[in-house]
């Protein structure tokens, strides 16, 4: 028996870390915001890549598992390296796959 069963997406998120960016301020009628900007058409040195699981279904299941709930996930995983990574991460986070 599970405390929570989530249904949803399972994705692989990739975060690229670099020092070659700048913040620019955009002002429009709704207010102002800062955006992360890179030079158009240029190559950017990526210092580190981080791979994590993402998607509403898996993120919710992992978060609740970390809070001590017994969780399971229902969703579609394909075949291949990315799916293997997601599966291993969910097992590591104590999320059952149904």
List each model region and its residues.
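Alpha-helical transmembrane segments within multi-pass membrane transporters and channels
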Residues: 76-78
């Amino acid at each position: 028996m599970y405390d929570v069963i989530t249904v949803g997406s399972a994705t692989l998120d990739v975060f690229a870390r670099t020092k070659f960016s700048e913040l620019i301020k955009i002002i429009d009628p709704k207010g102002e915001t800062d955006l992360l900007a890179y030079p158009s058409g240029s190559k950017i040195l990526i210092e580190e890549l981080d791979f994590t699981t993402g998607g509403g279904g898996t993120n919710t299941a992992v978060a609740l598992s970390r809070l001590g709930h017994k969780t399971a996930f229902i969703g579609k995983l394909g075949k291949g390296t990315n799916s293997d990574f997601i599966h291993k991460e969910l097992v590591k986070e104590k999320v059952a796959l149904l």
